[in-house]
């Protein structure tokens, strides 16, 4: 295989875009940096699938390529998460022990593997996802060691050295939101709540962390909430 077959296209990137505020901020930053972005969203049977409609609308407004991939066929292999099974979504702070029920087994390894394959086919230089520092306590597949090893595995598994990048790996959601607010982003275009109801619940760990981020930035969350957890 000659060099032209394996060369990657500079500034071409695949971004895993859930429709949530972290990946929304990342997507917009990549676009503003002048990257040619291909957004990739996944339906894995999550109860908060409302985020996928948000993702679709955002990509349409940004006029960027977007695919929503249905992988619900593997849902029966990934039992035990309150995000996909008939298990109550826990309430309280994002870093509390009971939030471990929101872990979907091996989720990011699966999603990143698919995104890497897509990047190889596009000759994109990197896959981006919005893992951040606040995820480390609960989600093993958002920790620095995982990102580093996944990036190395990508290079070993393919002729094309596609990197896995998580720019917010050492930042909190408070800091990520600060970035987006400085860019003038509209977070009313995003969905964070783990419950798939009409309004955000205001009590699940994801809502609590989001509301905390807005509070710490002296900003008002544009989303409507059923209630707000003050504990």
From Swiss-Prot:
Binds 1 zinc ion per subunit. It catalyses: 7-carboxy-7-deazaguanine + NH4(+) + ATP = 7-cyano-7-deazaguanine + ADP + phosphate + H2O + H(+). Its cofactor is Zn(2+). Zn(2+) binds at residues 193, 201, 204, 207. One of its GO terms (molecular function) is ATP binding. Gene3D superfamilies: HUPs. InterPro entries: QueC (IPR018317), Rossmann-like_a/b/a_fold (IPR014729). Pathway: Purine metabolism; 7-cyano-7-deazaguanine biosynthesis. Its EC number is 6.3.4.20. One of its GO terms (biological process) is queuosine biosynthetic process. Signal peptide: none annotated. ATP binds at residues 17-27. Catalyzes the ATP-dependent conversion of 7-carboxy-7-deazaguanine (CDG) to 7-cyano-7-deazaguanine (preQ(0)). This is 7-cyano-7-deazaguanine synthase. It comes from Hahella chejuensis (strain KCTC 2396). The gene is queC.
